[in-house]
Design a protein with these regions (language model features):
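Short, Lys/Arg-rich flexible segments
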Residues: 1-192
Length: 192
């Protein structure tokens, strides 16, 4: 009793490369890591009201290979200087300007510095000693050098987003993606 297509099946099995499964797993790991970066960046961008591109370029992916099936995501969690948000411009408020000699919290007659989509009262632009331009603001309670660069804190949102999303995506997407990658590897070598 001969099984139909047995020779073809044996031929196909012998044609599957030894590194087909490691290649599929490396491909899967890279896909899952990329998805984690994308979703975490989107979440942080929504929370901090910063463009997704600015958040995404703070994370680097060292891709998994057949020999080393581990992907490493490195994230720059430092604060983001406000000057990176876009064009800075001074907007004059339409409120009644203060009279000469009157004290006001809005100095300069209510002009406010707007950078990207953020209004920063009491801020100004200055070139630092290192040649970079930054948005500066006076800091109360600081005796020496009472001005500081205006920054958006990114450490907490980035950490929480990446921790949540990496675990969730690993649970949900990894088995599915591994199945797709194995099918892809087999499809390349198997003849029907």
């Amino acid at each position: 009793m001969a099984i139909k297509g047995l020779e073809q099946a044996i031929d196909n099995l012998s044609r599957v490369r030894k590194n087909a499964i490691p290649a599929a797993s490396a491909m899967t790991i890279n896909r899952v890591a990329t998805t984690a970066i994308n979703q975490s960046s989107s979440q942080v961008a929504r929370e901090t009201r910063v463009r997704r591109k600015l958040v995404k370029e703070r994370s680097r992916l060292k891709r998994a290979t057949v020999k080393n099936p581990q992907a490493r995501i490195k994230v720059n969690r430092g604060d983001l200087p406000v000057i990176k948000l876009g064009n800075a411009r001074v907007v004059l408020s339409r409120r009644r300007r203060r009279k000469k000699g009157q004290r006001s919290s809005l100095k300069g007659g209510g002009s406010v510095l707007v950078v990207g989509n953020r209004r920063i009262p009491g801020a100004f632009i200055q070139q630092l000693k290192n040649g970079r331009w930054h948005v500066m603001q006076r800091v109360a309670g600081k005796n020496r050098y009472p001005i500081d660069v205006v920054k958006i804190p990114m450490a907490v949102p980035l950490t929480t987003a990446f921790k949540q999303n990496i675990e969730r995506i690993r649970r949900e997407r990894l088995p599915k993606e591994l199945g797709y990658a194995l099918q892809h590897q087999l499809r390349m070598v198997i003849k029907r």
